[in-house]
């Protein structure tokens, strides 16, 4: 309490004393206050507050108890107060002079005490009311819990009575809830009114009391709202359940009727599903009549169904049924039953009709089968041959099948359709069984054609088996014979090889027998006149020839090996005999004292061994000659190391000859020693006897040699071979005679030394030696002639074996072979055979010439070589003729090989062409299947690259075709006319197809290029529409903040400066779009294709016209002072412009700008993470906020300087009015694959640079230099990903997002409206800028073909163009940020929404899983730059968010910071290094679920040094110069 107004103005108030009263936790302090002469009581302190009611009933009761105690203690002081007042009265009576003062003191103290007691009484009443309120609330909550428990407990009912009692319980609970709710509301209202009244009573109202009243009211309202929310929700559930129960009761009667109808339909359906279709034609007709009766009865039940359906429809339309689904299901069930019944009726009618057709066809089949059975009996009695009978049986078999096929097919069809229930088709099965049994019985009697076919198949199988066996045998033998023959180094090894070849010879003979068997079977098949075996003789002929060749080769090798093995064995035996005789003649020295019988026995034994040795030695010699002859007759390279083998054999023969001569000398010496001890007379007698005997033998030999002298060398090989065999048999005797002559000569020398009378025998011995020497010379000549003659006849006979079978083949035309490999094999075999024949011819001629030369010697004058000379001449002529024929045949085969090779190469080219064409068609088809959204610019460019690849493949194919054509054109003259024509036609056909396909590819590529250019132009148009729309919106917004006519005038001029040059350029683009569309899709379709662009252009022009009109009207209204109305009009226009901005562009960009929008979305999302504080404003704007408030200086404009009043309007230089934007695909655009990156990143960078400019931040030049990135950095950034720039700039001010409806579509769509804003720099002369724009326009007006050429330029040129585009950007771009007041106005509703959601979360019955309202997006930054990764997550309870990097939990340290503000979570890295790159995951989790968002951080090197200052005039001059040069070069 305070004192009343005192007459003393300057009096002070003091506290005389104070009294504190405690009771439990309650406490009050009463102060006695004195002001001058006035004294009053005042409640200085109260704990708790007088209006504090507590938070629960227990707390309120405790407060009431403490207050009762406090009040009781205060009552105890009342007597002292009244005693003090009485004392004051006494003092006043005693001091009359100051009675007035004491009266006043008494009055104020009394009033204060009464007031204090009254307040405490009122608080006690307040606490009592509060206790009653909490009690009512508790009862209300208990009732709510009971009702909730009632709802949560499942209720089951089996009858309508139980359902009605349950409905009564619902009504009672609802009524009690309403009563408790009204009672609680009354109590709360009573308590609130009491608090308000208590707060406003008397003069005791102070701030503490007001605060206590507000706190208590808030508690009451919160508890009341919580309970009322539960009550309302519970009441809704009660009403809903009651309504459902009443609807269930309403449906019971309908269900009963529905069950009755359904039961009849179900029974009828079961009958229809189980009834048979009949077992005969009469039975089936009876069932058809019953079915017609059922149709009549079904119509009555259909009417009952329609009645129920109408009732159900009325129930559904009249009320909102809780059991609507049940009713619908029952109704649907009834409909399904009716439909099923109708379907079954229709099916049964159709099946009965089909069964009727089946039984009719079955009766006809039985009639035909009866006739066939009678005819079969007739055929059996006639005794026809197998082929004739087979033909008859086949005809009858066909007739059986044809006659029963219809009935059986109808039966199978009917059974397959009625397969769900086999009982219905039992009669059909039985009838089909009867028919099938009858057919099987008759088919068993018609088996002649099957037997005939089986026999034919057996023959064919046998032939195939034999031929397969022959081919396999040839395949096994051919690789063995392909190797060179190695006769080995020892007889055992040679014998093993010989056995192997003998086995091969046996195998060849067996194969030949199999081939003969196949030929016999083929002959048997030909007797059956089977046309399909016509091609087999050619194959058999080829196999016979191949087998014959292999047989000759095996025979030749076997003979060589046999001769070699026999030679080696014979030489070894001869060597053993030689060594044995040598040892005998060296060791067995005859002694004189030995018995003559012993010496004679030894001599005879040695003589026998000597004779055997001679035979074996000459046999070995003959085998060696035969082996050499075989080697000479063998093919070239047939034997491995031929010269070495011949040398080995010559060494063996030379060694054996020398050994024979040595042994002969040893034998003579042994004989001389043997007779040395005999008397001279005896030796002489023995000499004379031996001389006479030897002379007789020599004369006999002379007579034997006489027939040889008369020999005709032109005889047959047989006679010559017999003569040579006899000659070989005589060689041991001749050798023995030679040895005898030598022995006689030695004995002559020995006897002459002993003084024997030799004169009488000297002449005889001389004649003997002379005759023997002549005979030996003649024998050697005859032996050589005979050997060569035999060899000549052997070679001649071998030639006959080789040439005769080939004569017909050489004269005939070569067979048409399938592949070049077969032709190559046959050509190689022919060349090999010709070389062998030429070798044999040359060998025969050489032998013949040698024989004739030998015969012409004087010693051989009696030998006739006339016939041999004739044979030699004939052989030479035959050799020339055959060689010519063989060469001609090889030439034909070579031509065939060239033809096959050329044909195969052309076939390969055709296959390559087919493969290219198939893949190209697949490429076209896959591209045509893509929808319009997938067929974006990037996909189109990739398609063009693929088409270019196929064009290169076609050119490579053309080069291969040219090579093949050049190679085959020279050989066309050697081909037969038909083959040359075939190759020529095939080549021409391939060339034509390739030309046609090349034209298709070229046309398709041209179409794709035009489509690409069309999409580029459309993107340019859409880009201009977006910028123009955004500019119109910004100008409209800025105009609402302008307060002077001059500011609006400047704004209007700046807008006209932007829009005037760009509209004609946009109209040119639109015309180009129309022309391209008409060229691609035709006149009408092209016009429809361009309608959207034209319509949107008209809308933009209308908005521009409306804006200009609004600005003019605004200037007039500002002159008249009508600002409020003007602002409202502009706000309406501004809203319309925003609708225009967000409306038409969406549909246009779906098709043509989908990928660029995605790039912008990602770039904008990353920008949204960086540089934003909790109030949503960019950091740089907050840093300059103080400068903005203190500075009144505006930004200097290019033409005018604003006054103080004009500075109220945002500077027009901040409007960011761009000229015609550089599109991603224009001649001055970056490369095609960087559309997304440059569109998003450069647009964001240039747009953000405007936000760093403000009228209050300083001069223009400095701001321009700091805001624009360097050209090198810009060009490098264009090659990096689209998020590179986002880490260097702050988040753009989201003005357009707040004003457009994009905010309701999520952050992704909100960020798609960032644009490149370009205008003429303040320092650039307007003439230079206009000239640059004019040159750019001229470059875009080039022809379509030139634009297609420019589109294919290198990335280097496009990168330079990107640099020019960067230099043309004004640094003072961007939108003016809103004031803090407008920002508060925009944030306000969001705060209310958040509070509302918080209140809802208190009473929600279930949690909300985490949800990312902003996701992470991939970021690419330069090393050393700052970066922020930010997400925004919501959910209830509030989710906890954890950051992970590469799978490991991320924690804050000195390098990075993990930040959290409300629902936003972010990771901030001031300086990025390469180690920071990787996958980052933000995982949000609460009790309702877990959710994560991922992004990849890329770190690139920083190679571009910053440019601290730019000379804009120089940059613009460079830009214009490069543009002019580029335009001139591309003309």
Curated annotation (Swiss-Prot):
Output the PANTHER family linked to this UniProt entry. Answer: COILED-COIL DOMAIN-CONTAINING PROTEIN 141, IGLON FAMILY OF IMMUNOGLOBULIN SUPERFAMILY-RELATED
The signal peptide stretch is: none
Where is this protein found?
Cytoplasm; Cytoplasm, Cytoskeleton, Microtubule organizing center, Centrosome
Q: How does it assemble?
A: Interacts with DISC1. Interacts preferentially with phosphorylated forms of myosin regulatory light chain (MRLC). Interacts (via the N-terminal region) with HDAC6; inhibits the deacetylase activity of HDAC6. Interacts with KIBRA (via the C-terminal region); retains AMPAR in the cytosol after internalization.
Alphabetically ordered keywords of this record: Coiled coil, Cytoplasm, Cytoskeleton, Phosphoprotein, Ubl conjugation
Q: What is this protein called?
A: Coiled-coil domain-containing protein 141
- Which parts of the chain are coiled coil? 67-94, 865-892, 947-1000
Q: Where are the transmembrane segments?
A: none
Q: Which residues form the Ig-like domain?
A: 1410-1498
